[in-house]
Swiss-Prot record:
It comes from Saccharomyces cerevisiae (strain ATCC 204508 / S288c) (Baker's yeast). This is Putative uncharacterized protein YDL185C-A. It comes from the Eukaryota. Partially overlaps VMA1. The lineage of its organism: Eukaryota, Fungi, Dikarya, Ascomycota, Saccharomycotina.
Length: 75
């Protein structure tokens, strides 16, 4: 009779675990969605500036910081 009156007492361990894993899953989904949209933007930038970055990367031994200060941020 006690089980039918208070059925949540059987799930004292399950409910916090379910809450914890659901919060973890939701935060992972949010991070994945943000990463997806950021990567879409970054891939568009890479398509625009890809040749510039590849040329700068091949000329890194020639260019110095005084000539090309933007080389610090090229990755």
């Amino acid at each position: 009779m006690r089980f039918f009156l208070f059925p949540y007492e059987r799930f004292q361990l399950h409910q916090p675990l379910f809450l914890f894993f659901s919060i973890c899953f939701l935060t992972l989904r949010m991070k994945e969605r943000l990463l997806r949209y950021n990567l879409r933007y970054l891939y568009a930038l890479r398509n625009v500036f890809g040749t510039f970055y590849s040329n700068q990367r091949s000329n890194q031994n020639v260019a110095t910081l005084s000539k090309e200060p933007f080389l610090v941020f090229s990755f």
